[in-house]
Each structure stands twice: as C-alpha cells, then as structure tokens.
Amino acid sequence: LKILDDVRKKYNVKTLTDIHIPQQAALASKSTDILQIPAFLSRQTDMLSAAASTDCIVNVKKAQFMSAEDMTNVVNKLKHYKAKEIWLTERGTTFGYNRLVVDYTGMLIMQKTGCPVIFDATHSVQCPGGMGTSSGGNREFVEPLAKAALSDGPNMVPLEEFEGMLKRVLSKS
C-alpha cells in the first residue's frame, strides 16, 4: 500500500487495488483512490458495503457467471451504502469450458446504470484451463475486441501489457 501511495503522490495519478476481505477497505482507502472488487466477490454485500463506506471510487469487475443485468443489483447495493463513485468492468462471460466470450450489448446494458463502464480486453481473451494444466489466451484477439468495444462506447479500456496498442486501435478508428 505504501508503494501505491508513493506512486499516486509522485506522479499525481489515481491508483487502484483489489480488496479481498471487507476489513481491507478502510486500510487500503488511505493509500489508493480506487478500490476494486474482484469478480468472484462482486455479489458479496459485506464487500460492497465496506468499499462504499470509504471515499474511494469503487470498481466492480463483473463475474464471468453474471449477466449485465445482474450488475444493476450490485450498483443498487453500492448506492444504498452511499458509494462516492461506481465503475463497472466487463471482462467476458463463460461460454462452455475453457472459453470466455464478449457480449457487447452487455456494456450498453451496464451503461444504463449511469456508471462508467470499463472493458478489459486482455482478460476477455483468456482461456481458463485452456492449456491443459494452466490457463491460456488468444492475444491476437485483444486488439480487434478493444476496437469493437470502443465503437460500442465503453467509457474506459485498460490495455495493460500491450505497449502501443491503444495508439494502433485509435488510429484505425
């Protein structure tokens, strides 16, 4: 947490960190600007309540087993607990075994909540367990998915690990 705090002060940027138990929210909120709720914890009321009770932005990653419509319940819980600002992240939906797919209409549905929507193109190409003994992915699909997402209008597209991709995607728009 000290490193996150140092980075945000030195570079004047917002920092983000996951929390995994409700008790981490208060401590993490002193050192970061955005508390992120991991996908598999995204329906846990105690996690949402703890994150909302801070002054941080709360970013919730949509679990692969949830529909876009289910995120309305998440947003309503966060609003009930007076979250300062809420972001939602689309990361793909489970499609059979070893496959995630992206339903772009889901981003439009989530935008109806009034919250900014982030599209995580790198997670969306993941193939959980797809290598037999480990997870794999299809990097060649990251750029086309990100470009398609930009045309559908998510508010943010994080492009971690892919140097220069944002420039290429935007130049093709």
Segments and roles (model prediction):
Residues 12-15, 36-38, 94-97, 134-135:
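Short, flexible loop segments at the rims of nucleotide/cofactor-binding pockets, characterized by
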Residues 156-173:
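C-terminal helical cap(s) of enzyme catalytic domains, especially alpha/beta-barrels
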Residues 19, 39, 62:
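Conserved residues at beta->alpha junctions
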Residues 1-36, 44-47:
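N-terminal active-site wall of soluble small-molecule enzyme domains
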Residues 43-160:
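Catalytic alpha/beta core domains of metabolic enzymes, predominantly
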Residues 8, 75-78, 173:
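Conserved hydrophobic residues forming the short capping helix/wall of the S-adenosyl-L-methionine
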